[in-house]
A protein has these predicted regions:
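An anion/pyrophosphate-binding glycine-rich loop and adjacent beta-alpha core
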Residues: 38, 210, 216-299
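Core beta-strand elements of the Rossmann-like FAD/NAD(P) dinucleotide-binding domain
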Residues: 3-6, 173-182
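N-terminal Rossmann-like FAD-binding beta1-loop-alpha1 element of flavoenzymes
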Residues: 8-32
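Conserved redox-cofactor binding core of oxidoreductases
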Residues: 95-174, 186, 230-233, 253
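Glycine-/small-residue-rich beta->alpha transition segments that form the dinucleotide
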Residues: 180-182, 186-191
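Glycine-rich active-site loop/strand segments that organize a redox cofactor
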Residues: 51-82
Length: 299
């Protein structure tokens, strides 16, 4: 078995893993693992945008929108941190080179589901790709960070309830151990387990399963976020995502009777429920979306 050592091992090369790598002291050796190409993370697939506190007067509204969307089961202090740090993080992303849309020389904002007002920054309809590819380019230039592609974590190295790194295997099933003082899981969810998903198929919840096996505390694992709208297909595998900002900018949903059946900017779980109810009512595997209001150029 090949043995490697690092100060920190980060499992996952999406936005969170890359952002973590960028905040590690430069004298610390970092190894990042990904099951596929570094570009094949769900962070690359996000279309609509990223929310940010527009100004101090927006805090209460932003807080209420977020808590309501989470059925008030959110960890309040985490929501506060997310909101209060959002502007600094956006400025940091811009500093790395992320190009958000502007209007009249100022940042432009759109609206997405569950938000009562526009507070979403975006880059065309490929915001995730813009953010994550920019971060990846910066990380790849760091001398203290090594990215290992097509390497799958199989377990953690644990003794006396302490984590000392991870066990992994490469594309040829060659086993390796990576000993590290700190281990960061940033490896996504379980979308790849579903027949129909907007996620990459290799996202199979490995870290969640390993955490359960080792008694690592998890929270709200029964909550799976479902994106309400994809382009209908009978084929299995990754579906084409229709961005939430499409509805935020005015696209409407209709049943087979040609009538609207819901507010299109409801929180994702409720929007998904409304669509499923309409599909059952219509005895159809899909509903209709009219986005002509956006205009041919935008579409």
């Amino acid at each position: 078995m090949e043995k490697l050592e690092a100060d920190i091992v980060i499992v996952g090369t999406g936005a969170s893993g890359l952002f973590a790598a960028l905040h590690v002291p430069s004298d610390k050796k970092v190894i990042m693992l990904t099951k596929s190409d570094a570009e094949n993370s769900d962070s690359f697939l996000a279309q609509g945008g990223i929310c940010v506190l527009r100004d101090k007067n927006d805090f209460d509204s932003f807080m209420e929108d977020t808590m309501k969307a989470g059925h008030y089961e959110n960890r309040k202090e985490s929501v506060e941190i997310m909101i209060n740090s959002s502007r600094d993080i956006i400025n940091e992303l811009i500093g790395y080179g992320v190009d958000f849309a502007t209007k009249d020389g100022k940042l432009d904002y759109t609206r997405e589901g569950a938000h009562s007002k526009p507070r979403i920054l975006f880059h065309e309809d490929i915001t995730g790709k813009e953010i994550t590819s920019t971060l990846l380019d910066v990380v790849r230039k760091l001398e203290n960070v090594t990215i290992m592609e097509y390497v799958t974590m199989t377990d953690i190295i644990e003794k006396d309830n302490v984590c000392y790194g991870v066990l992994a295997k490469d594309a040829n099933n060659n086993e390796m151990s990576i000993e590290a003082g700190y281990t960061i899981f940033a490896c996504g969810g379980i979308g790849g387990l579903y027949n129909h998903s907007t996620n990459y198929p290799h996202l199979t919840g490995d870290a969640i399963a390993i955490a359960i096996q080792h008694g690592i505390k998890l929270e709200n694992v029964d909550y799976v976020q479902i994106h309400p709208t994809t382009l209908y297909t009978k084929e299995k595998g990754r579906a084409f995502l229709i961005s939430e900002s499409v509805r935020g900018e005015g696209a409407k949903l209709y049943g087979k009777d040609g009538k609207r059946f819901a507010n299109e900017v409801l929180p994702r779980d409720i929007m998904t429920q409304k669509i499923r109810e309409q599909m059952k009512k219509d005895d159809m595997p899909y509903v209709w979306m009219d986005m002509t209001v956006l205009g041919e150029e935008v579409i």
